[in-house]
Amino acid sequence: AKYDDADDWDLMGETYEQFTHINLKRQQGQFFTNRLVVNMMVRMLDPEIGERTLDPAGGSGGFSTGMFRYLRRKVIENSLPDSHQRERMLGTIKDSVFLVEIAKRLVKIAKCAMLMTGDGQSGMTRGNSLDSYDKFDPWIQARCCKGKLTAPDIIATNPPFSGQKIESMVSDVSILKSFVFGHKAKMDREGNYTFSAADDDILLTQAPEILFLERCLDWIKPGGRLGIVMPKGFLDNISYEQYRQWLLKNYVLNGVVTLHKDTFQPDTGVRTCILFVSKPKEDEVIPEDYKIFMAISQRIGQDSKGNSVFILDGNGKSTGQLNHDLDIIADAYEEFKNGKPHQDSEYIFTYTLKGLKDHYNINPQHYSPKLNAALNQVLEFDNKDHWATTTIGQLESNIKIYMGPRWNSSNIKVDNPSDTSKLTPYLTANGALELRRFSIKWIDPTKASSKQKVFMDMLKVEEGDIMITRSGTIGKMTYATKDMADNYLVSDDLVRIRVQDENLRAYLVAYFASKTALSLMLLDEYGSVQQHLQPRHIQEMLIPVPDDWSLAQDMIEAGNKFIEAMEAMSKADCEIREHGFDKMCNTEPQSSQIQS
């Protein structure tokens, strides 16, 4: 292919990347950035001809080849075929794409990927990007290093994550001491964090992605821009608060995109996001307030097994076009950067720096127009006669909102028992949600330690408890019937809400069954792998309450009908177990329903 035959080179490069992805994944367990994510990030960073781009955690070269393809298309669109101008511009971009990767084999693969994409492989180098700059490859030091005119204008990267595993954390003191984030931070009374510079305050370990974030922002030239994949928990977990504050005080956060949970499947289920950040120019003052682009990706073109998901036509047949929304997000970001008006939607919108919630929360979900509309609907009750808005934790003086203990029952769990008469049934969150008890686990209490027996007592529920799923798919509500309370242990993955007043209980059942309540719970979910809720989120959740229960009589009646239906279904399930067909066949009724 000719050097400027973009389609041919793109096809060869894509084929090679797919081949190496499959083979490396099998051999080394490497995690690769979804090509759709690469393309979106490159579009949103929008490199110009002559700008230097870098991936400091380069892997097999996905971002480098993506940058090169994007720049080559720009050259072709802005020059005539076979012209000296085109040749000159193609030569410029060939020398403008850089990569640093610690694994020697991956550097070789990245070079091959660049050759298959149409050259530009000279910038692919081996090194540890967390080392001091003077230890980098001389090629990088001369052509793409901090503090020089040749410093990178753009960094696009997906750094290694620790996943909070000790063996994946950075513990090298010689590295940690050179990073702000390698030191402890202290918070003053005003909530401002200060990072120590003392050697006595060097952390024992730090997550590599945190160090990469700092290194990337230090590396790019003033006025440069960064696109970096990070764990989703970075956006709102309190443990990352000091890093978010530092980021927002020293740089401009242009945008945040949360990625679909299947983005890196089947390699890993870690939930991820992308930060788009600009480094102020020298003497540039960061505005006190500005708009931040936010998006929540809902479609990624594949399922949890990595199988492609295509758009279907009107007849239900595949169009061959991947079903994803990353191009839509990139289009909206382009309009945002160009100052063009863009209609806010449920999943793509803007928010202001000053409007950010406590703890420098930058998770788009917390600012979703749809979810916040539900919050505003609840707050409106403060303006209605005979109504007020309060928190669920303040509804009753002796209200209890809690979850059971985390425990390990593997040594006392019995799989597929033939006799369950001396065993204790245990319900997972999904099992508790079932109207009939299909998914019962069985526990042998005679094998339990004294500590496990204490935990078993704590996992019992009381009749009338309202339970909310708090992990994975959060916000689903169920009710503790008499049978459940008398006979079952229930997973700690359900938050328990216990109230004494019957009207209040029915009212809460109806409230938690509503879309409004679900939206409020989704506003508070958090997590890097699975989404979670804590009892405190339920305690602090807003709810409208009337001065007199007669004002909510219809809602209370609806809640009571739900409770009555749950009890009736529970009794019917017990009856059919005891007197159904299994009884006629003289088979043990409980075990016939087991799906361990």
Show the residue positions of the predicted features.
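A short beta-sheet element
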Residues: 457-459, 466-513
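A short glycine-rich beta-alpha junction/loop motif
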Residues: 275, 487-495, 526-553
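Conserved Class I SAM-dependent methyltransferase catalytic core
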Residues: 192-263, 268-270, 274-277
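Non-catalytic DNA-recognition/assembly elements of restriction-modification systems
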Residues: 333-413, 547-596
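Long recognition/docking surfaces used for binding and targeting
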Residues: 1-21
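Sequence-specific dsDNA recognition surfaces
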Residues: 393-414, 430-463
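Flexible, glycine-/basic-rich loop-and-beta segments that form/coincide
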Residues: 265-380, 386
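Conserved S-adenosyl-L-methionine
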Residues: 30-157, 162-166, 173, 230-233, ...
